[in-house]
């Protein structure tokens, strides 16, 4: 069973201000099968870059001035996701960005299910000092360029694989494992 991880970086606090996106497809063994990364030009009205955001991800307005916008990238992103479910670390943020951009650009909301690796990590490792992706990546000795959307997506998948503890062969097995922990697949846009 494959799954896709996703991460966005934003220019400011608005979810529509995405300035980069990273996706990674994994198989059940934790092998990265494919990746997708792009800088993204935020739409007009959402394109102001805040200093705090630049400090976090290092992306500046000049970096995205010739980048494609979400309207151009969405068909490629949607194709990459395919029928797989999504995983994001702090999914409320990343799924909020995705749903906001889909609505803003007038696309139909796709039938996408997702899980939050942050929520799962809190249930699986309740005594961890921190459940931030940076802290978990360091704990597991993962190479990591924090706040690069592709690195965030890849490490999200690696943490998710560890949290699922070998239960990724069949979706029903994964669902049972998660339900016992009070976690269910959610639907995008709901």
PLM-predicted stretches and their roles:
Residues 101-104, 123, 139, 159-166:
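Active-site catalytic microenvironments for nucleophilic, acid-base chemistry
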Residues 114-131:
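Short alpha-helix plus adjacent loop in nuclease-associated cores
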Residues 159-190:
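Acidic two-metal-ion nuclease catalytic site recognized across multiple nuclease folds
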Residues 109-113, 131, 169-172:
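Short, structured loop/turn "capping" segments at alpha-beta junctions
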Residues 148-162:
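Acidic, divalent-metal-coordinating active-site segment for phosphoryl/phosphodiester hydrolysis
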């Amino acid at each position: 069973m494959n799954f896709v991880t996703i991460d966005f970086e934003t220019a400011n606090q608005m979810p529509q201000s995405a300035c980069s996106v990273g996706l990674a497809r994994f198989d059940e063994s934790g092998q990265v099968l494919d990746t997708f990364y792009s800088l993204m030009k935020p739409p007009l009205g959402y394109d102001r870059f805040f200093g705090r955001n630049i400090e976090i991800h290092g992306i500046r307005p000049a970096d995205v001035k010739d980048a494609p916008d979400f309207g151009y990238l969405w068909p490629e992103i949607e194709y990459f996701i395919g029928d797989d479910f999504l995983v994001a670390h702090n999914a409320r943020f990343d799924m909020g960005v995705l749903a906001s951009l889909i609505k803003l650009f007038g696309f139909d909301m796709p039938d996408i299910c997702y899980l939050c690796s942050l929520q799962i990590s809190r249930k699986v490792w309740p005594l961890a000092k921190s459940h931030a992706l940076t802290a978990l990546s360091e704990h597991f000795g993962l190479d990591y360029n924090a706040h690069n959307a592709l690195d965030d997506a890849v490490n999200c998948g690696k943490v998710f694989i560890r949290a699922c503890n070998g239960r990724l062969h069949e979706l029903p097995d994964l669902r049972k494992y998660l339900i016992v922990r009070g976690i269910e697949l959610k639907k995008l846009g709901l």
